[in-house]
């Protein structure tokens, strides 16, 4: 969400936008704990970043089974709770350190109810000068710019992977559903979007979720438009 707040900058009051975002990566962290937790915080940053806001603070809340239990007590087809807890913490920390984001509050809950599926929740708070955020309607002839890291084959199926049924075959296939994070690239975009001269050129901005180009670009168009025609250009 985004709200207007007064902020005092160099002794002068300015109109700023304050943004909040939270995201859960329960399924990705359950199957690939390092990447799942890393992209949990990465995804949290990505949403307010598309709103042209800079993320200043984060929070992490997780839930898992008792990490002290013996390996033999691990449920069939599951990673040990200790492996999940330690590797997820390393993944979250790695992404946060690379992008330079402080996590001021962490709460790790241990309960048998989280053995079936882990809880991995991240939350952030971001802000931007209201004058630097333009929200206008797209028009014919507008240019759609794809900005960020190169697209790979990782993460395919991630949008539906958390909801579909799994069997033992999934153990050898579902890890590829977890997107590979790219904190240094996201950090570059963060720094770019702190320049108001850049962000004021943007009519509408959207982040890439699991739906990819078709969803991200489609959401940029107004709901009453029947189609969006794209002519690809590589630079």
Each model region followed by its residue ranges:
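Glycine/proline-enriched, intrinsically flexible loops and inter-domain linkers
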Residues: 1-229, 233
């Amino acid at each position: 969400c985004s709200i207007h707040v007064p902020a005092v900058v160099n002794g002068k009051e300015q109109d700023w936008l304050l943004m909040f975002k939270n995201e859960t990566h329960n399924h990705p962290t359950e199957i690939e704990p390092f990447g799942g937790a890393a992209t949990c915080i990465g995804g949290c940053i990505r949403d307010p970043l598309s709103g042209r806001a800079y993320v200043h603070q984060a929070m992490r809340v997780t839930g898992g089974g008792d990490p002290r239990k013996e390996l033999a007590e691990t449920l069939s087809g599951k990673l040990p709770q200790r492996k999940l807890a330690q590797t997820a913490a390393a993944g979250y920390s790695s992404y946060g350190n690379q992008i330079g984001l402080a996590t001021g509050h962490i709460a790790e809950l241990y309960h048998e109810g989280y053995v079936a599926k882990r809880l991995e929740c991240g939350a952030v708070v971001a802000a931007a000068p209201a004058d630097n955020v333009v929200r206008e309607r797209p028009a014919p002839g507008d240019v759609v710019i794809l900005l960020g890291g190169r697209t790979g084959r990782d993460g395919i199926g991630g949008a539906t992977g958390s909801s579909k049924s799994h069997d033992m075959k999934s153990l050898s296939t579902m890890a590829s559903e977890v997107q590979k994070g790219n904190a240094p690239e996201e950090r570059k975009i963060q720094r770019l979007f702190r320049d108001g001269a850049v962000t004021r050129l943007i009519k509408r901005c959207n982040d890439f979720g699991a739906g990819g180009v078709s969803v991200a670009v489609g959401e940029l168009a107004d709901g009453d438009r029947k189609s969006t025609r794209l002519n690809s250009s590589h630079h």
